[in-house]
Amino acid sequence: MTTEKINLLDFDRKGLRTFFAEELGEKAFRAEQVMKWIYHFGCDDFDQMNNINKQLREKLKAKCEIRAPYVSEAQHSADGTIKWAMRVGDQDVETVYIPEDDRATLCVSSQVGCALECKFCSTAQQGFNRNLRVSEIIGQVWRAAREIGLEKETGRRPITNVVMMGMGEPLLNMKNLIPALEIMLDDLGFGLSKRRVTVSTSGVVSGLEQMIGQIDVALAISLHAPNDKLRSEIMPINDRWNIEAFLEVVRRYIASSNANRGKVTVEYVLLDHVNDGTEHAHELAELLKGTPCKINLIPFNPYPGSPYKKPSNSRIDRFQKTLMQYEHTVTIRKTRGDDIDAACGQLVGDVIDRTKRTKAKQFDGQAIPVKTL
């Protein structure tokens, strides 16, 4: 019988130190040496770790592995965006690299599929299968960094920012999300600034409550409607946690956070003649008066079978100008990678849907009926 090896990508620094001490009988600094090899040098071969003694290397080879998701398919957009299908077990999630003049952002998935059933999102139409492990979340960053490193001659910019805006709802996977974020921020990990790591949530109030005082990163909230009636129609999660409850915990999080500089990013997808009217803009502006924020408008990115359309440029422009009358900071997200279905709301992966085979899903020990999400 073969014993499954321990994947070291599943540990943040604290967990790795504990594992080395309790399971390997090694001093903590050895764990930190190995962690530096993994993340600073992209190393997954213990034999290449030349400042680690041979006895420990042999012990690591016998008991451990460094295994990130692998790229099963890569698609390149005309604008430089790359979408990778990352293989996790017997399924794929999608990870997107978005280069810009002054940064390169990696959009990372947190779940295989999504259970939230937002009506305008392609991922939601795939159903939900499972949460990703720490190694499968941070492994997307590790693999992407290696892929970009292999293309140095192309002049591709190294990853400077990570956004948890891929497939899934990050705050329904807190057990694995928090250690992955810790590795992104850790100097022995990817060493990213907390202002360059963003978690986006559709309104999981219980998860955001847990984040207060536990992890400090930039926050983006998927609001997408100015009132509960409309939001519940397009985002069923609103029936569980309404806008008032959502914004209340958002205000508390940003008050406790240095990463957000006192403001949260409010994401608002514009759906033609659904939530993009002038009356919606006025209502949204009034709603957000008590919440320090910047508003990011996202023109809808179509996908096959969707009942929604992207608004005309004139409607988008009018919506933005109406919000700006209230002295809100308002930007319009530039669509990137839509020619390879890598834009916001278009990620689908390869998901074996399990939501239709069970009445409830278990998220971090809490049973949440799918129909009430």
Curated annotation (Swiss-Prot):
Active site: E94, C344
Occurrences of domain Radical SAM core (ranges): 100-339
SUPFAM superfamilies membership: Radical SAM enzymes
Residues reported in the UniProt entry to bind S-adenosyl-L-methionine: G168, E169, S200, S222, L223, H224, N301
Keyword hit for tRNA processing: yes
Entry's EC annotation: 2.1.1.192
Cofactor details (free text): Binds 1 [4Fe-4S] cluster. The cluster is coordinated with 3 cysteines and an exchangeable S-adenosyl-L-methionine.
Function: Specifically methylates position 2 of adenine 2503 in 23S rRNA and position 2 of adenine 37 in tRNAs. m2A2503 modification seems to play a crucial role in the proofreading step occurring at the peptidyl transferase center and thus would serve to optimize ribosomal fidelity.
UniProt name for this protein: Dual-specificity RNA methyltransferase RlmN
